[in-house]
Amino acid sequence: MAVKPKTTKAKVELPPFEYPQGYQLVAGVDEVGRGPLVGDVVTAAVILDPNNPIEGLNDSKKLSEKKRLALLPEIKEKALAWAVGRCSPEEIDELNILQATMVAMQRAIAGLKVQPDLALIDGNRCPELPMDSQAVVKGDLRVAEISAASIIAKVVRDQEMEELDKQYPQFGFAKHKGYPTKAHFEAIEQHGVISEHRKSFKPVKKALGIEE
């Protein structure tokens, strides 16, 4: 029997992002928390000052927690505007996670003290917005404004999970941040579901005995 050679997926290198011309105020928007079984989906919108650049911006998932925490005050200080938006577990259950993420992004943009004339959204789809918008695949790696938004959203949500951990230490939220890990599944099995769990997510439904 012939052994098939291992195939490795070639990494697709995306070209550097070219900013559309003719826009003065550009906001970057990103989300954190679509995958977890518990808590809000959190988004952030950031308008950076081109005359006051921030070194070391990158996708929040690729930065250490220490680096994210170091960059956060600098982003808040140097940005022309920043805001956080969110949707609760109840809204996620009512809308579905994709629509809830879009609503949370709308809320982040609406919360900016200065409204942008262009919003760059990480991913492949945009929420309905009152200004021009463009989806940017891997935007958190290619667009500084989106990287900054990614860092804010990640730090905010992680801190909320640490607070939830204080309320429910038996679940280990500070470690797994609500994601569907083995430890989280075991905690649900042992301790049940809390009000902050997303009841529409399959593992939570299963724990509640809700049939599909």
From Swiss-Prot:
Entry's InterPro entries?
Answer: RNase_HII (IPR022898), RNase_HII/HIII (IPR001352), RNase_HII/HIII_dom (IPR024567), RNaseH-like_sf (IPR012337), RNaseH_sf (IPR036397)
Q: Which gene codes for it?
A: rnhB
User: Which prosthetic group or cofactor does it need?
Assistant: Mn(2+); Mg(2+)
Entries under PROSITE patterns matching the protein: RNASE_H_2
**Sorted alphabetically, which PANTHER family does this protein's record hold?**
RIBONUCLEASE H2 SUBUNIT A, RIBONUCLEASE HII
Identify the CDD domains for this entry: RNase_HII_bacteria_HII_like
| Role according to the record | Endonuclease that specifically degrades the RNA of RNA-DNA hybrids.
The reply to whether Metal-binding figures as a keyword in the UniProt entry is yes
List the EC numbers from the record.
3.1.26.4
| Species annotation | Vibrio campbellii (strain ATCC BAA-1116)
Q: Tell me which residues make up the RNase H type-2 domain.
A: 24-212
A Pfam family of this chain:
RNase_HII
The alphabetized UniProt keywords are: Cytoplasm, Endonuclease, Hydrolase, Manganese, Metal-binding, Nuclease
Q: What is its main location?
A: cytoplasm
Mind telling me which Gene3D superfamilies this protein's record contains? Ribonuclease H-like superfamily/Ribonuclease H (3.30.420.10)
Question: Per the UniProt entry, what are the Gene Ontology biological process annotations, in alphabetical order?
Answer: DNA replication, removal of RNA primer; mismatch repair
Q: Which family does the UniProt entry place this protein in?
A: Belongs to the RNase HII family.
Q: Which positions bind a divalent metal cation?
A: 30-31, 122
What's a single GO MF annotation on this record? manganese ion binding
Per its UniProt entry, which superkingdom is the organism in?
Bacteria
Example GO CC term: the record gives: cytoplasm
Reactions listed under catalytic activity: Endonucleolytic cleavage to 5'-phosphomonoester
Cell compartments where the protein resides: Cytoplasm
Under what name is this protein listed? Ribonuclease HII
